[in-house]
């Protein structure tokens, strides 16, 4: 995505909606400028970063301060016209140089702490997700060079109060906000315009001659397809939470094979007949897992443990410990059955496949051998 595409508004019902940037971009920019100020020993009031999506952001710096080998800077979060709980708050970084050669990243005041398994971060760590961790560390390394070390602390004085308006506590992230953002950019869209934009991508793929499509919830699915399946991501289309809508659109456009690829946290819902996977529509992840574990003869102890989990990742640890990993093949087959039930009045329904993978990019299960599916997709 270019600077021009970032500046270009998103149009909805004739209204131009402004894009914004994530807490991850704010933290990255704040850390970069703080590191630069320590090195140069003068205040800087504007900083540029390149987001993971390739957008260059030029951001204003607030509250810059230098004291010896330490500097502090803040970036104000701007969600564009997609206003959320963190919009308008300051995200600070404190950078202290040292001779260790290592960069250490921590979360301070207002940054949540991970207290439960299942969010992809170690227990007790700061709620700074993987992509922002990488961009923060890379930006600081670029600023200080290969030999120096630095302690980087991200903090947000308003974080604890703002977090009350988020789902963090339900996920076991306590005491503040999360530093998040896979692309670094916030794109505001209503649901209908968002769905239409996704459908347009399907239309473009079909117009190029593709007969097989891979539908993924988000960026992680595309990475899995590329790295673990060895399939050209030209066939990948993001479906977000709109599973049913995108399947129907794929059928309308004449695709002959639909492959659903994603983490169980999203795809499990399809096994229960839930075709809009946003949590405000329906959840039932644990109930679905418990029901299908019971069908496979799982002991009551495992069913109880899974039923009490707050996240799919946490439930997966219990499932693995009890030796019920074969449930993922079972669920993948059930997902395909649900899709075919939805399409039961379609004259010539497409082939449907489903593949489930873990956060660390390993195959968990599929309705048939993944190699077989991948070979067909490469034709």
Swiss-Prot record:
Coiled-coil blocks: none
Catalytic activity as recorded in UniProt: Co-precorrin-5B + S-adenosyl-L-methionine = Co-precorrin-6A + S-adenosyl-L-homocysteine
Stated EC number for the protein is 2.1.1.195
Q: Does the keyword S-adenosyl-L-methionine apply?
A: yes
Q: Which GO terms describe its biological process?
A: anaerobic cobalamin biosynthetic process; methylation
Q: Which keywords does this Swiss-Prot/TrEMBL entry list?
A: Cobalamin biosynthesis, Methyltransferase, S-adenosyl-L-methionine, Transferase
Q: Does the keyword Methyltransferase apply?
A: yes
Q: Pfam families in the record, alphabetically?
A: CbiD
What is the superkingdom listed in this entry's lineage? Bacteria
The pathway it acts in is: Cofactor biosynthesis; adenosylcobalamin biosynthesis; cob(II)yrinate a,c-diamide from sirohydrochlorin (anaerobic route): step 6/10
Q: Which GO terms describe its molecular function?
A: cobalt-precorrin-5B C1-methyltransferase activity
Family stated for the protein in its record: Belongs to the CbiD family.
Could you tell me what this protein is called?
Cobalt-precorrin-5B C(1)-methyltransferase
Q: Which organism is it from?
A: Salmonella arizonae (strain ATCC BAA-731 / CDC346-86 / RSK2980)
